[in-house]
Amino acid sequence: MGNQSGKNNLKGKKPEEEEKEDNSNALIFSECINGKKKNKELCGQDAHDIITKELGENMKFFAVYDGHGLKGREASMMLKYEIRKRLINDKNKVTKFQRKEQVEKYFKDAFKSIQKKFEKSNDYDLSGSCAICVLIIDYKMYSINLGDSRAVLGSKKSTKKVALEMSIDHKPSRDDEAKRINERGGEVTEKQGGIARIFKKNEDGPGLAVSRTVGDIVAHDCGVVSEPEIIEKEIEPDDAFVVIGSDGVWDLMSSPEVIGFIFDKMETKKEFVAKMLAEESRNRWEVINLYKQKSMLDLAQSRESNNEASNNARNKNQENIQGALDIDDITVVIHFFNYDY
């Protein structure tokens, strides 16, 4: 659970080293649960960050970075390191921003520069990271989104609980994203598992399922970009909290569902809510996988016989069943605007 103080001395730090969170005001909490692949626990490719004290009294920043590919962990950590370093170094400038256009230019320039750093390495042809960040300056909140992680605001209008999405997922199935990809040498198809993915025209790769990332050099040659989208919102008295999470949360829980869950659980100690939400998401993955496993086992058993070909097929089915048990990393950060809400 993320409620530790952090230091801003990043000199000499490597991207893969985890920075401690700075959450001195005890209003921002986090939880991360590593995923599984073929029923084995993974080291996890998500990273997250919370910066409050180091940015001064009127500014806060928190983010989730969702890595993918063989170097996904390194990608998410490198992105975290670069954003943190820039924001702390530029805090005196950023804290004076009063318009959305200023925030847009700052983060678009930052991500563009970071992408150039990724391109200088040979490690990120097929690996990269998404990002969902929230910057708060006084009573204005800005969501900075790149990929398919998500930010959602929870408000209470009278007795009604309202979920306001503060980001729009960057999926190749989006018409505007698909148009750009097609214009730049890529195509969007559903070759693998019915999920819209990005391929170079007339080729079998890269097969990326998100349309904006850092890294992913091959995919950037066919329309994927590193330009984030920014949404601005003034924080109002009815606004209770904002939650950000990797797609491991949103794949099995809708935005209204997550907001309702947090409202229901925040009556207890708020510092446990991020952990409870992450565990609820993980439990849903487990239930879905149990259902998949049973369905595939039933199908495999109905086709069994004793000949060698069937035995080989049975072994292959077992491999497929294990593959169906993959569980994504789950990372949650929640900022409560008022601890006594």
Predicted regions and their residues:
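PP2C/PPM-type serine/threonine phosphatase catalytic domain
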Residues: M1-Y341
